[in-house]
Amino acid sequence: MKTYQSEFLAFCLERGVLRFGEFTLKSGRISPYFFNAGLFNTGSDLARLGRFYAQAISESGAAFDMLFGPAYKGIPLAAATAIALAEHHGRDLPWCFNRKEAKDHGEGGSLVGAPLTGRVLIVDDVITAGTAIRESVDIIRAAGAEPVGVAIALNRQERGKGEHSAIQEVEAEYGLKVINIASLGDLIEFMREQGGLDEHLKAVEAYRAQYGV
């Protein structure tokens, strides 16, 4: 695990974005941890989060021309990442997002920001079922651009209904590179290093043994 990944997980705990306990997921599974990126809800939180995304993206070596933020959660994430890439990594890239509802006045259309062209990196919080990513891929392709990857905050590294995770399915189905700031494996390593989280650590390890990929 890299330093920035450990710092990111500490930041998530500090802000209550990452919590331990018993949480029922949409899948019906009882998860020993919960991640809610919507709780990064101040200007400084969002700026710092953008820097973590930018770091992970830069270290991945992914080749892309612009960013796309899926409505709604992906919009501030793509904006914060675009700012961080420009300010800290010397990459001033265009970015774009979609509206959930097409506008019928003014400029109209369902896309806002830079025109979707070239190689596009999608920015979102997590991939659960992969539905939002599939919608984004359709939007990008319909505009004549090429989706090349997805950057997410946390990779839960767990199986979907079959043997593969939603992330593995997205990678295989669309040939997309998935970049994460941190993964479940990083979280477990972080918990071991931190100490004081032993009770939760056992539950997270048991969950990974049952549902992990």
UniProtKB/Swiss-Prot annotation:
SUPFAM superfamilies: PRTase-like
Residues forming coiled coils: none
Annotated metabolic or biological route of this protein: Pyrimidine metabolism; UMP biosynthesis via de novo pathway; UMP from orotate: step 1/2
Keyword presence, Transferase: yes
InterPro entries: OPRT (IPR023031), Or_phspho_trans_dom (IPR004467), PRibTrfase_dom (IPR000836), PRTase-like (IPR029057)
GO cellular component annotations of the record: cytoplasm
UniProt entry keywords in alphabetical sequence: Glycosyltransferase, Magnesium, Pyrimidine biosynthesis, Transferase
One GO BP: 'de novo' pyrimidine nucleobase biosynthetic process
Keyword Methyltransferase: no
Binding site for 5-phospho-alpha-D-ribose 1-diphosphate: 26, 72-73, 99-100, 103, 105, 124-132
A Gene Ontology molecular function term of the record: magnesium ion binding
CC cofactor: Mg(2+)
Assigned EC number: 2.4.2.10
Catalysed reaction equations from the record: orotidine 5'-phosphate + diphosphate = orotate + 5-phospho-alpha-D-ribose 1-diphosphate
Sequence positions that bind orotate: 34-35, 128, 156
Primary role: Catalyzes the transfer of a ribosyl phosphate group from 5-phosphoribose 1-diphosphate to orotate, leading to the formation of orotidine monophosphate (OMP).
Oligomer and partners: Homodimer.
Family per record: Belongs to the purine/pyrimidine phosphoribosyltransferase family. PyrE subfamily.
Cross-referenced PANTHER family: OROTATE PHOSPHORIBOSYLTRANSFERASE 1-RELATED
Protein name: Orotate phosphoribosyltransferase
Organism of provenance: Thioalkalivibrio sulfidiphilus (strain HL-EbGR7)
Gene (name only): pyrE
